[in-house]
Curated annotation (Swiss-Prot):
Residues of the active site: 133
InterPro entries, per database record: dCTP_deaminase (IPR011962), dUTPase-like_sf (IPR036157), dUTPase_trimeric (IPR033704)
CDD domains per record: trimeric_dUTPase (cd07557)
GO BP terms: dUMP biosynthetic process; dUTP biosynthetic process; nucleobase-containing small molecule interconversion
Stretches with biased composition (Basic and acidic residues): 176-187
Protein name, per record: dCTP deaminase
Organism: Thermomicrobium roseum (strain ATCC 27502 / DSM 5159 / P-2)
Pathway(s) per entry: Pyrimidine metabolism; dUMP biosynthesis; dUMP from dCTP (dUTP route): step 1/2
Region described as Disordered: spans on this chain: 172-197
GO molecular function: dCTP deaminase activity; nucleotide binding
Function recorded in the entry: Catalyzes the deamination of dCTP to dUTP.
Taxonomy of the source species: Bacteria, Pseudomonadati, Thermomicrobiota, Thermomicrobia, Thermomicrobiales
Amino acid sequence: MILSDRDIIAALKSGRIKITPEPDLETQLGACSIDLHLGNTFMVFEHSRFSYIDPRQPQSIGDAMRTIVVPDGEPFIMQAGDFALASTREYIELADDLVGRLEGRSSIARLGITVHSTAALFEPGWAGTATMELSNLGRMAVALYPGMRICSFTFEQLSSPAMVPYRMKRGNKYAGQKDPKPSRLAEELSLEQLRGR
């Protein structure tokens, strides 16, 4: 069950959803979602330095990315076909019986910008800024500004609290993040086993 605006307000008041800084409900609250703002930190792939990324090699992923911090009021230019990681300004904490979903905003999508490739789900017990996988699917560059409303976040009620919420899950790779982080796929056991072959 997706939470309505009144349910979101109640969950914020009770602490089942925590958002820092506190949202301006008049401008950010929709009928069943909260709009979140674009942060200042971006990570981009440096295509010219590497011919490919090997997910079995952690340094391959981290070394292939460069961090860019954009001051407020300045644009981050997404060229046509570009991909970048970014995060929300808001730090979100979910109760053990709530799931979060990051969704695009129509006004942003109409510029050709998608805010997530596939990673829209935030598990119960999640805490951190939401990392977005930004892509420019259009044929023109688009200026994105830190602080602009970039995505919407919806909340769903589970039938019961999770037995092992994300923050308690062994090997949770992104708990508590405050900026976008590169993929930590190389830490997964299946890839560790492949390295041994």
